[in-house]
Amino acid sequence: MSWLSSSQGVVLTAYHPSGKDQTVGNSHAKAGEEATSSRRYGQYTMNQESTTIKVMEKPPFDRSISQDSLDELSMEDYWIELENIKKSSENSQEDQEVVVVKEPDEGELEEEWLKEAGLSNLFGESAGDPQESIVFLSTLTRTQAAAVQKRVETVSQTLRKKNKQYQIPDVRDIFAQQRESKETAPGGTESQSLRTNENKYQGRDDEASNLVGEEKLIPPEETPAPETDINLEVSFAEQALNQKESSKEKIQKSKGDDATLPSFRLPKDKTGTTRIGDLAPQDMKKVCHLALIELTALYDVLGIELKQQKAVKIKTKDSGLFCVPLTALLEQDQRKVPGMRIPLIFQKLISRIEERGLETEGLLRIPGAAIRIKNLCQELEAKFYEGTFNWESVKQHDAASLLKLFIRELPQPLLSVEYLKAFQAVQNLPTKKQQLQALNLLVILLPDANRDTLKALLEFLQRVIDNKEKNKMTVMNVAMVMAPNLFMCHALGLKSSEQREFVMAAGTANTMHLLIKYQKLLWTIPKFIVNQVRKQNTENHKKDKRAMKKLLKKMAYDREKYEKQDKSTNDADVPQGVIRVQAPHLSKVSMAIQLTEELKASDVLARFLSQESGVAQTLKKGEVFLYEIGGNIGERCLDDDTYMKDLYQLNPNAEWVIKSKPL
């Protein structure tokens, strides 16, 4: 029995359009027994070209049939794509060096985690002055603090075993001070506000969960997509813990159909939504530290193991197109196009696919001819940067195969070696909301080059799906085809059992589906993390101010007189309830604006742009932005719907500047 025939009757429960429900576990077990060794696939990096394969008597690519039949065949898409990848690797003449993942020693994993979380000065030679870390720790939630404490204790025990003479402060003492200060707050306001903010979303979440649970009783075409807001004001791990403690959480089986996935949305925040790219580098660094701690805390609360991996450095190409690290590729691209954030070859391949139209049936699914793909690769390597490559000779399916090949042949995965296991573990989280929250944090943690390229890929995939009526590529089909290109490479040279491979197929396809469907939400920085950054900055300012006062006192400087003069100057310059907006690059460089309840950032921009003349008049909305600078934030680009009075109350010491975004 061939693998194609054996898999024909296997359907992922998550994608089954009918009311006949089977458990995922039983499906996996059955598939594991029936699968043959041809499904095995272990190598991560290899020179691969897509190739045609022998198909069933009823060609899987002839899909001008009902939508239900398309969904039932989606699992077949996964195995066909996997077979294409395997055959292309067998046909390739060159073998790229496999990325080796280092197995960490005892305590090494936790030590590396603390470094990544910005807490390296809690141990080692710098442990003598942990003040910066103490400020950082004082801003953490209880679940975040527990995650840090757990890992510090492991490192501490390991170092004692190795007789290392490092002084490691007991973070329980630090957190005891933190808890004491919170407990003495009048009325326990922090705990109450946390639960209040969470409870206002809880009813909506439960309602959405009920809709998901009842979906099987209603035909898919009549099922309304449940809508629920994502709570970005409260720590995700805190939400999970509170739901766990109150036993209100309804654990739902993963479902992949668009008809059953909740239609998550971001509630409007009067102080503005913060997206990746809106913050200054120094604040974004703090965001990444907090995102790692929050992700770990979420996995800890839900009992999911989170292990970071580290790739051993291997020799890679530093020029060319394929098998080149993203950073090296961007460096050579930026010499041609300054400010380039996405590889030129990646953009050109997407552009070539779209030039021929996205309505082509089987787009992304049907592979290009293996020999032709191999020849195109060699020709691209030789002529792309010279500008002499003939793009007219590239067929649409060939361009799609080259795009997938580019992703597979990256020396390290697009989802990064460090976090690919965490991406895979997303499938183990109990609810879709928690899976979405984890993916949000993981996207934040990706290196800039990986994150930007992933964003371009997901946006392209969505455009393909938008033409599903003609190209027969639903979100499930696209997820099934793309999942092995992003995830199966993560075996990193290790073989896996057939049953494990099937489980991974189901899980990674579901995760790919979530990445595509919720991509607009995933590039948002949660408000609770931004608030923690603000708190850290405030505490650091206080510390710096105390140090400055001591310095001024030693210098016998007339501090009081200076402060009075400075205060009187500021008070006279900006009346109460008015902000002064600076626009150094516009013809009107400054304007005093009265704050009102309804004044938005877009209104401020409109006032400036309406008064422009000459060359500056050509500026359009979207070319310049209003920034919040200083106070309790480094720098933040404001979205149009930010209510200025609310933000002013949150950060009264900020300056307001209109400028363009840096490249």
From Swiss-Prot:
Positions bearing the site annotation: Arginine finger: R365
Cytoplasm among keywords: yes
Main location: cytoplasm
PROSITE patterns in the cross-refs: RHOGAP (PS50238)
Basic and acidic residues composition bias: residue spans: 197-219, 245-258
Gene Ontology molecular function: cadherin binding; GTPase activator activity
Positions of region (Disordered): 15-37, 179-227, 243-277
Subcellular location: Cytoplasm
Pfam families: RhoGAP, Ubiquitin_RHG40_C
Alphabetical list of SUPFAM superfamilies matching this protein: GTPase activation domain, GAP
GO biological process: one example: regulation of actin filament polymerization
InterPro entries, alphabetized: Rho_GTPase_activation_prot (IPR008936), RhoGAP_dom (IPR000198)
Chain positions with Phosphothreonine modification: T158
In-chain residues carrying the UniProt-annotated modification Phosphoserine: S66, S69, S263, S610
Cellular component GO terms held in the UniProt record: cytoplasm; cytoplasmic microtubule; cytosol; nuclear speck; plasma membrane; ruffle
Disulfide linkage: none
Residue intervals of the Rho-GAP domain: 324-523
PANTHER family: RHO GTPASE ACTIVATING PROTEIN 18,19-RELATED (PTHR14963), RHO GTPASE-ACTIVATING PROTEIN 18 (PTHR14963:SF6)
Function per UniProt: Rho GTPase activating protein that suppresses F-actin polymerization by inhibiting Rho. Rho GTPase activating proteins act by converting Rho-type GTPases to an inactive GDP-bound state. Plays a key role in tissue tension and 3D tissue shape by regulating cortical actomyosin network formation. Acts downstream of YAP1 and inhibits actin polymerization, which in turn reduces nuclear localization of YAP1. Regulates cell shape, spreading, and migration.
Protein known as: Rho GTPase-activating protein 18
UniProt source species: Homo sapiens (Human)
